[in-house]
């Protein structure tokens, strides 16, 4: 009788563990689905922001492509490249909180306006703080405007304090900015851009 009772208790514990495991799997699945939907929505928002200005249209896509080219030269594997590409599409997501009048201003920004636009790095990182599907996405979003000499923003990181993923995006972002036409300046040819990057090595 005692043995039967022990077997029943043991069976109950097994059943409870199975149910608990199934419930956890279901919760994990739902969380993943919610994150995937959130990422798709944010990518759409990022694309919408860029579409408002003909000069930045497609910027995130191009930065993602350039970043992958750089990372591939560094020997990254396909999983790492795919992750970097997905993260790059969101690097400017924080700009959804920046007024269009500042984002699309055709002339030089005032100090106050530049202070406002710098906030997009922190805003973007906060938006993505609960996203775990893409590795390093928060550090890319927060740190892609840091400079190697410590004069970047928002945290004034210097040298290797800046995460490698963010450093790659910074170079890709700079390349796209210089190769794109702007109201206030013409686009630069590839050889001139390479020279500019070389000249600023160790600072930007």
Annotate each language-model stretch with its function:
Residues 24-51:
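Membrane-proximal linker segments that couple transmembrane helices to downstream signaling/catalytic modules
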Residues 39, 46-204:
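Metal-dependent catalytic cores of enzymes that make or break cyclic nucleotides
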Residues 2-32:
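Juxtamembrane or sensor-core-proximal signal-transducing alpha helices
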């Amino acid at each position: 009788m005692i043995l039967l009772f022990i077997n029943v208790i043991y069976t109950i514990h097994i059943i409870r563990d199975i149910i608990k495991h199934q419930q956890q799997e279901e919760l994990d699945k739902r969380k993943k689905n919610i994150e995937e939907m959130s990422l798709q929505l944010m990518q759409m928002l990022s694309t919408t922001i860029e579409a408002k200005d003909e000069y930045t249209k497609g910027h995130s896509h191009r930065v993602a492509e350039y970043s992958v080219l750089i990372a591939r030269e560094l020997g990254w594997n396909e999983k790492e490249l795919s992750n970097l590409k997905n993260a790059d599409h969101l690097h400017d997501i924080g700009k959804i909180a920046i007024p269009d009048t500042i984002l699309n201003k055709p002339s030089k920004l005032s100090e106050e306006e530049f202070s406002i636009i710098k906030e997009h790095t922190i805003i973007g990182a906060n938006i993505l703080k609960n996203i775990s599907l893409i590795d390093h996405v928060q550090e890319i979003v927060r740190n892609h405007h840091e400079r190697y000499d410590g004069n970047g923003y928002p945290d004034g990181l210097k040298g290797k304090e800046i995460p490698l993923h963010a450093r790659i995006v910074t170079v890709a972002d700079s390349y796209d900015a210089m190769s794109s036409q702007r109201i206030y300046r013409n686009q630069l040819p590839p050889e001139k851009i390479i020279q500019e990057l070389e000249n600023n090595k160790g600072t930007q």
